[in-house]
């Protein structure tokens, strides 16, 4: 039997991996995909990595990108969940990627999965314990997790930057993602991967990133499928529609000027001379991170720069101005619910007229209950599910042949804190990495994780999540959205939901926004 690929050559030199915990998989950690973005390359588009001599041992994760480390506060759900090591190495030199491959031969042409981590484009890293690519790789997939620039390092805009490089004035973190994915396309055959069968995926801000990549003219033909987890919010009773989370270049440049003035930075040259930790601390104080929202809270949003991002990514997707590849979109059952903030029926009627105009009566009929409390409960909806429905309805109108899939994670999450299916809780299951979590998961949780990982792996392979589980059994049928208008319910057991499960208010909102979009 052939050995696994423990040593191989990429465009800049030889790399050596090491057996993962599962000896059927080889991992390569810390492969440089671009030059260090330091000095004169700070706030520049990623540049080619330099060649190295000999064989590069890729046995440990590279430093994480510059960020405010969340620490290990036991009273904070997210720091408790991911247990981020406060001593983890952090450096501006962070443009590296990690690969898990089960291939025995370089010509196997296995499907490829490229993962963009979340964290609000402010924090996060591919070394988080839930992102272990081993279990997906065991299913015959080459898994790649990438690092990219964040916060002020990844999304600063400034008139001097625009004058210096008008073709890449900002969005450096998004450019890193695209550059890494292009590196994968050029080099993944060396690890037994198929450069013509790449799926990109991400969760939260990683899911938003996937949407930007889906709509960028610079990524045409780069990937064949995409997975978006908890990455889109649409609609709000409060009138603040967060579906775009974009800035124009002019707005972003104004933010950059404001930051420089606040920090006492005279010009771009001076900013590039600042030590990275000093710059990070200045930005933390400017943005009010850790002490409420400050003026910098939009500085890590994608920017409509006219080159990489041509418009609001969600609006472009809703108008089918995207790469028309199959999508798999998911959300969790407890995250991001919206409910009208009113105290009386009269206030609700006023809100309905403000939000829905001449269709306010339809809305009120859809949510009507025996009393105010029941009516407000009927008005609850998940903006992430609404965003998915709008995306898929828009696709079906012009591309009925394209099959898209949706799921809601509704598994029970054990633990003394009784957290529900909180935002990001599904990551342990999709990567089947429950054993790394502190929570007292039992057999049914491991069964669900196995199924979810198999569904996702099947989609990565073929664009269809249906097929065999890793244990050889046939997975419960998952119908495409165009077939049933419903989601797969990730739970014990997994169950297909149909159109009848959609609430009246969700039906109304979907129709209302589709007509509004035009």
What are these regions (language model features)?
Residues 1-171, 195, 333-336, 441-452, ...:
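Non-catalytic accessory segments of hydrolases
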């Amino acid at each position: 039997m052939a050995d696994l690929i423990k040593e191989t050559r990429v465009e800049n030199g030889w790399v050596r991996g090491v057996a993962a915990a599962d000896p059927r998989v080889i991992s390569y950690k810390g492969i440089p995909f671009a030059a260090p973005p330091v000095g004169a390359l700070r706030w520049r588009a990623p540049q080619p990595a330099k060649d190295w001599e000999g064989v590069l041992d890729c046995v440990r994760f590279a430093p994480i990108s510059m960020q405010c480390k969340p620490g290990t506060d036991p009273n904070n759900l997210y720091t408790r969940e991911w247990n981020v090591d406060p001593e983890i190495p952090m450096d501006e030199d962070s443009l590296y990627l990690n690969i898990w491959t089960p291939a025995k031969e370089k010509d196997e042409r296995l499907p490829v999965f490229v993962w963009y981590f979340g964290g609000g484009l402010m924090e996060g890293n591919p070394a988080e314990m839930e992102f272990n690519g081993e279990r997906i790789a065991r299913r015959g997939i080459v898994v790649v997790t990438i690092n990219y620039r964040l916060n002020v390092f990844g999304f600063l805009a400034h008139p001097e930057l625009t004058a210096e490089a008008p073709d890449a004035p900002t969005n450096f973190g998004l450019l890193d993602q695209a550059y890494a994915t292009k590196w994968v396309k050029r080099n993944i055959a060396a690890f037994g991967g198929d450069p013509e069968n790449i799926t990109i995926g991400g969760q939260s801000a990683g899911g938003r990133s996937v949407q930007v990549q889906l709509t960028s003219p610079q990524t045409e033909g780069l990937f064949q499928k995409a997975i978006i987890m908890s990455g889109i919010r649409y609609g709000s009773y409060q009138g603040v529609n967060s579906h775009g989370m974009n800035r124009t270049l002019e707005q972003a440049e104004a933010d950059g000027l404001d930051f420089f003035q606040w920090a006492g930075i005279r010009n771009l040259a001076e900013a590039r001379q600042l030590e990275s930790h000093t710059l990070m601390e200045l930005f933390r104080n400017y943005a009010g991170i850790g002490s409420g929202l400050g003026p910098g809270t939009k500085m890590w949003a994608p920017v409509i720069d006219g080159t990489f991002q041509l418009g609001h990514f969600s609006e472009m997707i809703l108008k089918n101005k995207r790469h028309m590849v199959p999508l798999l979109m998911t959300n969790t059952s407890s995250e991001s619910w919206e409910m009208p903030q009113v105290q009386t029926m009269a206030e609700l009627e006023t809100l309905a007229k403000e939000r829905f105009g001449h269709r306010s009566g339809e809305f009120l009929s859809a949510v009507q209950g025996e009393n105010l409390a029941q009516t407000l409960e009927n008005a609850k909806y998940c903006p992430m599910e609404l965003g998915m429905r709008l995306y898929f309805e828009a696709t079906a109108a012009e591309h009925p042949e394209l099959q898209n899939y949706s799921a809601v994670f509704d598994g029970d999450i054990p633990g003394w804190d009784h957290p529900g299916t909180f935002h990001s809780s599904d990551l342990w299951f999709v990567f089947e990495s429950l054993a790394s979590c502190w929570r007292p998961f039992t057999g049914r949780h491991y069964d669900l994780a196995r199924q979810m990982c198999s569904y996702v792996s099947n989609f990565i392979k073929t664009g269809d999540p249906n097929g065999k589980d890793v244990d050889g059994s046939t997975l419960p049928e998952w119908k495409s959205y165009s077939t049933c208008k419903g989601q797969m319910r990730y739970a014990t057991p997994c169950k297909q939901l149909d159109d009848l499960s959609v609430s009246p208010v969700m039906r109304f909102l979907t129709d209302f926004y589709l007509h509004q979009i035009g």
